Amino acid sequence: TVCHKCATPCPVDIDFGDVSMAIRDVLRRLGNQSPNPAKSAAMFFLNTNDPGTIKLTRKLMIDWGYKAQRLGHRTLGKLGSAQTRRPPATTGGRPPVREQVIHFINKKMPGGLPKKTARALLDVEDRNYVPIIRDPAGTTSDSEAVFYFPGCGSERLFSQVGLATQAMLWHAGVQTVLPPGYLCCGYPQRGAGQFDQAEKIITDNRVLFHRVANTLNYLDIKTVVVSCGTCHDQLLGYEFDQIFPGSRILDIHEFLLEKGIRLEHATGARYMYHEPCHSPMKTHDSLTVVNALLAAGTNGRIEKNDRCCGESGTFAVARPDIATQVRFRKQREMEQGAGKLRGDGFSGEVKVLTSCPSCLQGLSRYDDDAGTGADYIVVEMARHLLGPAWLESYVQRANAGGIERVLV
């Protein structure tokens, strides 16, 4: 795996995440990598940056594909109950196709996702223009500007995450500069062992970002905002301090904490926090940030819910049999965590919050088992600070004169 969890306790200081990626790259170049249609489809979705292709692929994979998986879960879910109660061993290679299919549908995919990507909703898909998003009534051309890199998960898949980040930056009174067009950071390609593709993406992105920085040097950008941990990890190698001199990379939640933006009222829900393997919060302790943002004194202290969610990018579709084993342990943690929050007779909503798009998908699979609801921290904040119709309101206001498009 590429979670890098082995690196910390390893007595000889070997990062087996890096080793795994290197082995995959060698096997691919030698032509010995096992074919996996589901993984190939996912990588195709991440590699393309053509708006039309993304729209079609999203329709087929996310809209129809997720619906088909949920239908399979409803129809054949009982066949998977034995797997989730006691996962079978995975030694000896892959299980038969029939078992793999049951592993794939034993926990349902999330539903109710936005019908379009964040860029499509804001009409900023043209890669020849850099969008600058600002509140015309609350900002000027001299207001603080940040560069927001949404990444694939927050932009193409869970577009509500990217939009919530933009809405909260709008609320904070800053100008938000988006990259021109759909971009991937390159981490998924490295994780899949496609080192040559990853290097091409990284090089192209860095050249593009230098052009953006030269074009918008009057904005004096000092902060690069991210909403995804793997994007954060990958962007650390982009040398942004040479692109935007003196800049730093900061997670959206840490940025909001620094701006003093947090909930001040009771939400009626209780929370636990799932920390991703690739945590985007690297400046402050993640649990401290979550408790500060969500008013722990009013809504109750938020505890960490341990164990991997079992999604891990393409892991759950590439090896659903192993993902079933990982989920078995996580489900116990989820049920115990939710039970603790309900221990005093609390009958309201229990939510598990995270800061990773892939984990958001993985955690939503436990909704029925643990009686929880999975969501993103910044989405929960937008809902309670900006109102239940925050997404529609933000899109409407941004499209009504809040977007400047600069040719790059």
Which residues fall in each region the model found?
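Cysteine-centered iron-sulfur cluster-binding motifs in ferredoxin-type domains/subunits
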Residues: 1-14, 306-308
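Iron-sulfur cluster-binding electron-transfer modules in prokaryotic oxidoreductases
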Residues: 17-408
